[in-house]
């Protein structure tokens, strides 16, 4: 039952980001809105044709296929872990990572770019220009949970 919950949560999170991206696509270009009453978090529409921060945007086919392969590998790893007992932290991390990976991969294949929409105002102009989406946060949080899971596993193993 827990495995179904994990798979359902993964699908829900991916669909949530895809739905938000569909709404963001209706926004006018170049418009920036504050998120709620925040002065630091802004919403804006950015089309990213590359990977993180438009890296490799000159090679859209490479980016599309690399994204597809990596999302597939992450999904297989997630499915293999879901079959085992324990490792809840790793399973949660993989589920988050898979949700973010597929959300961005589907964007690349359906639109030809990834829709990013969350930015942060900082004192550094370069950092302020970086724009994210929920899928990016899912990937980052998932990576942290996987690393934490591995760290705790090795720590416990070493203390026995």
Indicate residue ranges for each PLM-predicted region.
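Alpha-helical transmembrane bundles and membrane-interface segments of multipass inner-membrane proteins
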Residues: 1-160
